[in-house]
């Protein structure tokens, strides 16, 4: 078994680029166990960043901390800063529900509401008092077009979301997330339950979405990370080990551990 120097780091920063998000000394604890060990990380605006690493390395925990999904776990504690447009969204005075309108989440398994396709998109707006049908119609059409689903469902908008295939349901969940106009989309293994065709369609949707959104995706699929992302970050045991342009990570990684992981020789 190869021995690696886990004190080595290679982490890119973006001093001259527009940032979508930045973490400073971010720690996540579950009870007494530290799951994320003080991560400093910057995300460039309108790019796709992939988070990779072995199961249990902390990448999903880190992702969920970025819009405070870990708040729902009683024993979880998050310290450090999560900076969005200069505001620390980890601060105690932040309205979490308002913040999530700016930093949306798409989960591993499609989770459409038990409503029509149309109502899945308009639900949040209607809850906030939007009633004008023309406005809602425009939101539905725009969101479904951006998610690459409009042409497939435009004649079936009032059918149950559960009539859609798995891949279509996942794109509906993306449409639902972007309907409230977030700046950032967090995706936790969004293709894990999809077949190869649906996965490719999802990746094509991501390429189109990055024109308007910054995307951070957790994936176990190295081919997907290589194909679909601009930057890749390698996590191990709660630490950010290497972070660079995806091409460099997969073709000329700075660290042996990263090179071995992406090439399947890790261990």
Curated annotation (Swiss-Prot):
One cellular component term (GO) for this entry is:
plasma membrane
Keyword check for Membrane: yes
Instruction: Report the subcellular localization.
Output: Cell membrane
Give the residues the record marks as binding ATP. 53-60
Report the record's Gene Ontology biological process terms: phosphate ion transmembrane transport
- Membrane topology, record value: Peripheral membrane protein
Predominant place of localization: membrane
List the Pfam families.
ABC_tran
Where in the numbering of this chain does the ABC transporter domain appear?
21-262
Q: What is its EC number?
A: 7.3.2.1
The entry assigns this protein to a family as follows: Belongs to the ABC transporter superfamily. Phosphate importer (TC 3.A.1.7) family.
Role: Part of the ABC transporter complex PstSACB involved in phosphate import. Responsible for energy coupling to the transport system.
Subunit and interaction comment: The complex is composed of two ATP-binding proteins (PstB), two transmembrane proteins (PstC and PstA) and a solute-binding protein (PstS).
- Report the protein name in the record: Phosphate import ATP-binding protein PstB 1
* This protein's encoding gene: pstB1
